[in-house]
Design a protein with these regions (language model features):
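ABC ATP-binding cassette signature C-motif
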Residues: 1-193
Length: 193
């Protein structure tokens, strides 16, 4: 199964008391494949995606991604903290880069300390700069602006609790896309848009 980005073998799903949602599903996806799952309401499309995302693990059979694959999943009703702003939600996708930048600023300041351990600081600086380089962290604000513009997000300072369903969905989609998953699963991606 290693040649496939994702494989399912004889997957089934039963919910109590004895309601069978999926039966004997076998699928394999090549890297780069674009797949749509079509079916009537209640036919198990969302259940299938939750299984693929690893959210639902109580299944019959086997379902697994290729080792090292990062899966991004946008459910029909994405979870976004209503107390946060649009920017805060979107920045969750790049928290590792933002944290590395904040720590790097602390490292730069630590060089000025009289008892600074230059070797340790230089090693940490190299590690943090590698994180920033890998994620194009020096252009992070530009990346965020481009993504927000492309998805027509509300203003950065808008609170999630005041957004429409479609706006919340676009904010969650932006966060997901910026997290750069290897495999993207979108459940009813055009709902509310």
């Amino acid at each position: 199964m290693a040649q496939y980005v994702y494989s399912m073998h004889r997957v089934g799903k039963v919910v109590p008391p004895k309601n069978r949602i999926l039966k004997d599903i076998s699928l394999s996806f090549f890297p780069g494949a674009k797949i749509g799952v079509l079916g009537l309401n209640g036919s198990g499309k969302s259940t299938l995606l939750r299984i693929m995302a690893g959210v639902d693990t109580e299944i019959e059979g086997e379902a697994r991604p290729m080792p090292g694959i990062k899966i991004g999943y946008l459910p029909q009703e994405p979870e976004v903290d209503p107390a946060k702003t649009v920017r805060e939600i979107v920045e969750e996708a790049v928290s590792e880069i933002k944290d590395a930048q904040a720590r790097l600023d602390e490292v730069y300041a630590a060089y000025a300390e009289p008892d600074a351990d230059f070797d340790a600081l230089a090693a940490e600086q190299a590690k943090l700069e590698a994180i920033l380089q890998a994620g194009d962290g020096h252009n992070l604000d530009r990346q965020l602006e481009v993504a927000a513009d492309a998805l027509r997000l509300p203003p950065w300072d808008a609170r999630i609790e005041h957004l429409s369903g479609g706006e919340k969905r676009r904010v969650a989609l932006c966060r997901l896309l910026l997290s750069a998953p290897d495999m993207l699963l979108l459940d009813e991606p055009t709902n509310h848009l």
